[in-house]
Amino acid sequence: LKVPVPVDDVPAAVVPFRRRGLVTVVRLPLRNADARQEASRQLRELTDDGAPFELFLDRLGKVTVTHRVGGRGRPSVYTRKVDPLFTAPGLKIQQITLRRRMRLIMVTAAVHSERAHEAIAVGRESGPLTDGWQALGDSAVVSVAVPAGEPLERGRLYTFLPMGAQPTCPVRGFLNAPFHTDVSRRTMAESTQWNDLLLDTVAEACTQAVVLRYGCTCHQRSAAARATSASY
């Protein structure tokens, strides 16, 4: 990558964006056939509904992806709708609706601050983590999303965007956390106490969500039974 610079003359390909009122347009020319092939591969991967890129981007409103071939292209629009289901200190459960009405139940949990600082300190002392990781000690969260209907055959790890197919996700869902990864953010780095803590937090969050779900159901049934008994 090179440092972007403003241009004096607006390229013809950018003019339609200006007419639509867009303020910032970044145009990256592809230098050769290999670069074009790689860009096409990444575009196909990005728009693969098997691992929706927009799932954990909670500030996202809408993304339109248009792949033009021979001057023609059909836009694909990606949106994200959130419906809160349950909120408790350090935990929230939401229903996420994506394009094509794909619905998922998402559980998001805060990482315990004391355990986070301890894991980061260990990682800094042993080498994998740098000083910049300290900021996550009080703000790290993990999320796991599962389809509202049939479960996935295989899960996928995310670091905000989908990682590669390896390593294997421990749940049949989509799992997002600020993992320590390689530079490409596609594979896990070596085993670290930090990554282990994030996975433990996911397991604890799922357990808590199940207890809350069925605990509420049992409480409601008990209340209904008491009301029925009282009526007799």
Task: Set out the residue ranges of the language-model regions.
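GHKL/Bergerat-fold ATPase module
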Residues: 1-232
